[in-house]
Amino acid sequence: MSFRHIGQCVLLWLGGFCAFSCSVKEDRSDCPCSLALDLREVPSAVPEDAFPVRWHLSQGAWSDTGLLSKEDCETGVFHVAMPRGGAQVYAVTGDDGMFNAGLEIEPGHGCPPVRLWTAAIDARGENAQATVRLRKMYCRLTIRLTGTPASRPYRFVLEGGVSGYDTSGYPVPGFFRCRPDPSPGQAGKTDWTACLPRQRDDSLLLHICDLNAGEETPPLRTFALGQIIAAAGYDWTAADLEDLTLDLDFAASTLILGTDRWTRTLSFEIIL
């Protein structure tokens, strides 16, 4: 069964449950379990444009899935009838339907702006419950470059060692490479942005390349970005990943890394 609207959920569930249930006089060990998913924390954790939230419940060969709108989540609790036993459940948004048996980031792309919650459910009794807490599983990195000749355009390449998430939401080791997208920034400058997955170590690299050079041309400069982020005190294990801003000023030979809460300034030597 799949219930996509909370308003219909109780009636549908009760109707299906009658054909799928037991009387009090019968052995109730084969009766289904009623799983209640508490959605009250979802509306405040998910931006308006990130709905609907997709949920998926699986137990062996059995599975059920559906979509939840913001209005659905604001009603509070969502009920699902399921076979008894252990089960896995997840709720996800921002993944473009890519999260199934985990999430694999496509080569050449950044991490999708995914918010995720996963849990193991003990559904051996007649009732079970869980609270859905969607977590921000990506870091939006914004790069700003100043102090370079306007006649020499650049591009950036990010490389790292995490290529996605497993079914429990843990980072999966693998090759990651993407080119941040340019967009108009402040004061006529260009911002480059890319979404990074949760990191397992500090191996993340930032390459600065000549825009007109071929893909095989060595970069003009490589920054050990993972080490810089670690030295700044950024927490990749936080429940919700913070976004980062990286300001590179080649005229002043400074690098400023920051979030909404703090900034760190480092010096470097470079000739481009």
Tell where the protein language model's regions lie, with residue ranges.
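Structural motif
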Residues: 38-51, 144-151
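Conserved "repeat-terminator" motif of extracellular CCP/Sushi domains
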Residues: 130-138, 196
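Tryptophan-paired
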Residues: 51-103, 154-231, 270-272
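Extracytoplasmic beta-rich ectodomain segments of secreted or membrane-anchored proteins
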Residues: 137-159
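Bacterial Sec-dependent N-terminal signal peptides
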Residues: 2-3, 15-43, 265, 269
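Structured interaction patches on ligand/partner-binding surfaces of diverse proteins
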Residues: 95-129, 213-252
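Bacterial N-terminal signal peptides that target proteins for export
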Residues: 1-10
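Short, low-complexity, Pro/Ser/Thr/Gly-rich segments in the mature regions of secreted, periplasmic
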Residues: 257-272
